[in-house]
């Protein structure tokens, strides 16, 4: 009987999580997170809370995942709406890749996101410019 991690099943479950508590529940005690704007931290609930504050409707699809017994790499597409004040919502889409390591219980011990932070920034700037122009 194999004890190998079922990464496809993990990916589908990950796609369904909603909110900071659900994201934090993926992690083992002391599990760490890092991305291009967040240095390594164990406060993964805050990471999710901060993301929700910027993109309340954030949704992430795992496009492809590969891994071993205690690690995986996945490519993803995230979509959301950025809303500044009373202005119109600006839809964004971004792509990235994530490297995760898990413990024997399948809980994340290390999560590192790789993404181009200019991708959503450019989309937001373009959306704001269009709104100012009346379009």
Where are the language model's segments positioned?
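A solvent-exposed, acidic/Ser-Thr-rich amphipathic alpha-helical stretch
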Residues: 4, 13, 18-71
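A beta-strand edge to alpha-helix "cap/lid" segment located at domain peripheries
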Residues: 49-135
